[in-house]
Amino acid sequence: TVTNSWKSYTLSMDRGVKFSLDRTDPNDTGFLVTAENVIREFARNALVKEQDTYRIHRLYELANGDAAHNTTHIISAALTKTNAIATVSGLLQTVRDDAEEMDGYVALISHKHKTAFLEAANGTYHDISFGNAVSINGVTYENVMMLDDLPCVFVPQSRMKTVITVQSGDSDQGGIVAGENAKDIAEYL
């Protein structure tokens, strides 16, 4: 026999995010409303965006801070139908020449440029396919574009910024947002 008593709790995270857990019947939820599940959903729906933003920004910051590579490894060109494939292929060749490694690269491309690749796919000698499932470091990504042998993951532009601000989380404001004078990152390899 299961007996339930109810006490209301408010779960708050370190990002100024609060969840209100309403009274539920275990028969309806199957005991699924637990702190673990609420935290997992927060991580899946909100925290992953912040982690992506921070990681991409940190990689950009490291490349931009390297005087030997910041002019060759960071591309500021806007991707269009006419230059998208050549820009990504050129950056891949630069990185391969520099690292002397031929495999293991992944391109992160702003989702707003996906149309440029779709439009350019027909008129090129490159092998471009969309909708692939690719395993990268043990994580399977769906809807990946393959440009020859390079997996290209389309990422929301909001996660690809040159400047970020980590908010305090003291009030309702929390998380990571684009910083003042932030520019868009079109692609990262």
Question: Language-model features: where?
Answer:
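Short helix/loop capping segments that flank catalytic or ligand/cofactor-binding pockets
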Residues: 20, 29-30, 116-119, 163
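Residues at beta-strand starts and edge strands
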Residues: 13-17, 37, 103
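Extended, solvent-exposed, turn-rich assembly/linker loops in the middle of proteins
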Residues: 64-138
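Sequence/fold signature of self-assembling virion shell proteins
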Residues: 10-12, 79, 119-189
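Assembly/oligomerization interface modules of large self-assembling protein complexes
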Residues: 1-15
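Alpha-helical scaffold segments that mediate packing/assembly in large oligomeric complexes
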Residues: 20-97
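Hydrophobic beta-strand residues in large extracellular and virion-surface proteins
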Residues: 19, 88, 107-108, 152-154
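Short, flexible loop/turn elements at secondary-structure junctions
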Residues: 15, 23, 111-113
